[in-house]
Amino acid sequence: MGGRRRKKRTNDTKHVRFAAAVEVWEADDIERKGPWEQVAVDRFRFQRRIASVEELLSTVLLRQKKLLEQQ
């Protein structure tokens, strides 16, 4: 091992090159949700909808039930 070091050639340096056509991805274009996530979202949305309708209808239905019981 003679202790000689190679001199680095100037044309061995790496250069950065960029593609002429850039491909842009929007967040909406990337499908990240699996089918099970969509089912879970639908189930949660449906539960909220049922709760809101129940709140509206319960007063009317309870009032009608009380009227029928009084007769």
From Swiss-Prot:
Classification via InterPro entries: PPP1R15, Prot_Pase1_reg-su15A/B_C
Molecular function, one GO term: protein serine/threonine phosphatase inhibitor activity
Positions of the UniProt region annotated as Important for host CHOP inhibition: 16-18, 57-61
GTP-binding as UniProt keyword: no
GO biological process terms held by the UniProt record: regulation of macromolecule metabolic process; regulation of primary metabolic process; response to endoplasmic reticulum stress; symbiont-mediated suppression of host innate immune response; symbiont-mediated suppression of host translation initiation; symbiont-mediated suppression of host type I interferon-mediated signaling pathway
Pfam families from the UniProt entry: PP1c_bdg (PF10488)
Inducing or repressing factors: Expressed in the late phase of the viral replicative cycle.
Entry superkingdom: Viruses
PANTHER family xrefs: GH11727P
Assembly and interaction partners: Interacts (via C-terminus) with host PPP1CB.
Function: Interacts with the host phosphatase PP1 catalytic subunit (PPP1CB) and recruits it to dephosphorylate EIF2S1/eIF2alpha and therefore restores the host translation that has been shut-down by the host. Also inhibits the EIF2S1/eIF2alpha-ATF4-DDIT3/CHOP pathway.
Family listed: Belongs to the asfivirus DP71L family.
Designated name of the protein: Protein DP71L
